[in-house]
Amino acid sequence: MAVGKNKRLSKGKKGLKKKAQDPFTRKDWYGIKAPAPFAIRDVGKTLVNRTTGLKNANDALKGRIVEVSLADLQKDEDHSFRKIKLRVDEVQGKNCLTNFHGLDFTSDKLRSLVRKWQTLIEANVTVMTTDHYLLRLFAIAFTKRRPNQIKKTTYAATSQIRAIRRKMTEIIQREASSCTLTQLTSKLIPEVIGREIEKATQGIYPLQNVHIRKVKLLKQPKFDLGALMTLHGESSTDEQGQKVEREFREQVLESV
C-alpha cells in the first residue's frame, strides 16, 4: 500500500508568528483650524501617517475634506441641521488650515420640511464670487397660508412658481456675485439670503422655510497662501524687519 502525505497533520514550525504591530504607532494627530467667519476655530483632530522617506504627511493632509456641524462651529443648537465642509489647504506645524468647501442640510431636516397641501419651489444658480470661486447654490422654499385664509391648500399657480423662481435666482445672483467667499460664508450662517427672498416674494405668494439648502464648490482659483493666512488671522511673511536695539561696539583685537 502506498503511503502518502497526511494533510491533516500539522507542519513543523518553520518560524515564529510575527507580532502584529499597532498601526496607530505610525500615525500622528493634527489639529484642524476653521477659517475666520466661524466662532469656534478649533474644529477637532485628524490622523495621518508620519513622514517616511518620500511619503510626506503634509501632502497626505492637503486636500482632505472635513464635515462639521454648524452648531459646533457657532455654539448654537439652532444650526444643528446644517453641515459645513472644510478643505485643508495648508499645514503649519501640527495645525491644518482650512477653507470653506461647501454646505449641506441633514436628510432628516429636508424630509421634515416637505408636507402636504403646499407647493415646493426649488432653484439653483451658478455664480462667481469677486475672488474667483465658482459656486452652485441650491435654494428651497415652500408656500404658506395667507392671513385669514380658510382654504386648506396653499398651491401656487405655475406662473407664480416661475415668478418666484426668477426672483430667487436674481437675489442669489446679486448677493453672491458681489462679495468674496468669506463674505458669502458670513451671509450663509445667519441665512440672510433666505430672508431676503421671503421678503421679496410676499407680493407674488407668501413663502415659509426659505433656505439655501446646499452650496457646491465647482472651481477655485490658484492657491494663495497670503490670503489663507489672513483668513486665519496670521501673516505669511513678515515684510518689516524687527528693529535691533543693541548698541554697536567695535571689537578691538589686542596685539599679540
Swiss-Prot record:
Domain of life from the UniProt record: Eukaryota
A GO-annotated cellular component: cytosolic small ribosomal subunit
Keywords: Acetylation, Cytoplasm, Ribonucleoprotein, Ribosomal protein
Entry's localization field: Cytoplasm
Gene Ontology molecular functions: structural constituent of ribosome
PTM sites of type N-acetylalanine: 2
The keyword Ribonucleoprotein is annotated on this UniProt entry: yes
SMART domains: Ribosomal_S3Ae (SM01397)
A biological-process GO annotation: translation
Span list, region Disordered: 1-20
Basic residues biased stretches: 1-18
Predominant cellular place of this UniProt entry's protein: cytoplasm
Family designation: Belongs to the eukaryotic ribosomal protein eS1 family.
Subunit structure: Component of the small ribosomal subunit. Mature ribosomes consist of a small (40S) and a large (60S) subunit. The 40S subunit contains about 33 different proteins and 1 molecule of RNA (18S). The 60S subunit contains about 49 different proteins and 3 molecules of RNA (25S, 5.8S and 5S).
Protein name, entry field: Small ribosomal subunit protein eS1
Gene name tied to this protein: RPS1
